[in-house]
């Protein structure tokens, strides 16, 4: 992410996440919802690949296998979290949350600064998810709800995770 072209690509993905969310919340159509989810998934997969390669030191081929493993991992996590009905549709973010926690724990001794950065990302995501979970119940009392907090914290979390990666790459050079 330290070269200009990489930074531009990263910003392009980040901006597409925002555009997908904007389109979904503006038009509430299936195609817009698909774009919203697709861009988040794309970022997740790219970050997982980069984290596997650059944080964990995995060769590209192993990083690719880990990245593709996200799909069966997500299915298993989805199945295991089915009883947690209070999560509602926020449940789809559980695989990301678990992976960030897992990477943070695995990197605790080898890359403590990255580990702490990922732990901060975990905290931001948990608070963000809580805002999303509480949105509908709180709408009865607070008409504005908390959905905007979800989006704001997601933007903060996205920027933070990119910054954790950027700092790591710079520290390696």
Predicted regions and their residues:
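Hydrophobic cores of alpha-helical transmembrane segments in multi-pass inner/ER membrane proteins
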Residues: 41-50, 95-105, 152-166
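Membrane-interface junctions at the ends of membrane-embedded or membrane-associated helices
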Residues: 51-62, 164-173
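Alpha-helical membrane segments in multi-pass integral membrane proteins
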Residues: 68-72, 86-134
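Small-polar-interrupted transmembrane alpha-helices in polytopic inner-membrane proteins
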Residues: 10, 14-26, 45, 63-75, ...
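C-terminal transmembrane-bundle signature of multipass membrane proteins
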Residues: 121, 126-139, 148-173
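Single conserved hydrophobic/aromatic residue that forms the stacking wall/gate
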Residues: 1-13
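Membrane-interface loop-to-helix entry segments
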Residues: 32-42, 84-98, 148-156
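Membrane-interface helix caps and helix-loop-helix hairpins in membrane proteins
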Residues: 23-34, 52-58, 76-90, 107-112, ...
